[in-house]
Structure formats: C-alpha cells, structure tokens
Amino acid sequence: KPNFAPSGLLAAATNTVKNADGTSTLLKYNEPPEARKPLVGWRLYVFKGDEQLELLHIQRQSAYLIGRDRTVADIPLEHPSCSKQHAVIQYRLVQQKDEFGGSKAVIKPFVIDLESTNGTHVNGEAIPTSRYYELKASDVLKFGTSNREYVLLHDEVS
C-alpha cells in the first residue's frame, strides 16, 4: 500500500549544500517569503579593540550567513566560541507606520541567531535565539565570546 505522507526528503535536499570534497552540509536557515535585497548600501565595519580589521559591503544579497563553516558562511568567523552556522543577517520587507497613521513597505535588516552555543549580542545585549531582531544603523554585533565587533552602517549614515 503506497504511503503518500510527507517524508521530509525533498525539504532536506533543498537545504543541502554539496561541498567540493563530496560531503554535504545541511543548512540551518531558509529565507522567508518577505526576503528582499536592500535598496541602500549597508556595511559592516569589523573591529578588534580600536583597530578596524575590514569593511564588508552587505547589500548584494538578501541574507548573509555568519559562522565558522567556510563552505556555507558568507561572513566567516574564526573564533572557536562561534558556531559553524551562528547567525544570519536577513533583509525583510516589513510594513512601517508613517507620521500620518498610514503604512508603507520598507526593507530593514534583521539578525537571527541560529541556536548558537554562545549566542549573538546586539549593543551588549544577548538576543533571543531563532527570532528575528531588528537592526538599526550604528548597532554593534558580537558573536559568541569573540572580541570582534561588527558595526552596522548604511550610506545615509557616516
């Protein structure tokens, strides 16, 4: 007798990335339907102490996976306290109320912690796991217990 119940195999196959060595990596994250590429140029300034290490332009795609697994991470992390798939910066189309009580659609950045072992911090505060947390210009992100700080800015803020 045939079994037409969902097996989950198709969903697992769409979340799997094949590596060059023949192994595969199961992604912890799927983009939501409201995912959009940003209309303004967002940047992440990476600092260790007072020294700027690099500048990352993060407006070319709608989501950036952050983690230690270099085969899937868009923004690789080196620190051992960071998870292989630690967090995602996701741009989402959301409704925002204007000063007249109406609403308009805007694209905003959010961060979501992918149930990492040592957490994600925004402006020194730990954020909840598996939930979108809205980011604003000048927010400071930290991953795990790493000392590196990632400062988020966009073209209208310098």
Could you tell me what each predicted segment is?
Residues 142-143, 148-154:
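Eukaryotic regulatory low-complexity N-terminal regions enriched in Ser/Thr, Pro, acidic
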